[in-house]
Regions:
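Positively charged, solvent-exposed patches that mediate nucleic-acid binding
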Residues: 1-105
Length: 105
């Protein structure tokens, strides 16, 4: 299933206001059912310079791509990583799978 990226500030704002939230030690997820699968990533400046922030975004996109087939419905999702020493695709995948099971997505 193809997913589309959330790009507009209005889309992010709508999700932040009306979406449900789920948390893990390394990740916060805000989601809401929608007609098509959309995903956005919000990485703050506390994560370092742009090189580190862009790397985290690449890792999150890859982790989401790997687990999106396990989702039952289509959602609009924002992924927000927490500040940590270690970021890896496997860690993000594990955390996303846990959220999908817990929230019955």
């Amino acid at each position: 299933m193809k997913y589309y990226r959330l790009k507009k500030q209005a889309d992010f704002s709508r999700l932040f206001q009306k979406g449900k939230r789920a948390f893990t030690p390394a990740l916060s997820v805000i989601y809401r059912p929608s007609e098509k699968m959309t995903m956005g990533i919000s990485v703050g400046k506390k994560h370092g310079k742009s090189v580190q922030r862009n790397r985290i975004k690449r890792l999150l996109r890859e982790a989401f791509r790997a687990v999106q087939g396990e989702m039952n419905n289509t959602y609009s999702i924002v992924l927000i990583p927490k500040v940590s020493e270690e970021y890896s695709v496997k860690n993000f995948e594990r955390q996303l799978r846990w959220i999908i099971q817990k929230e019955k997505m």
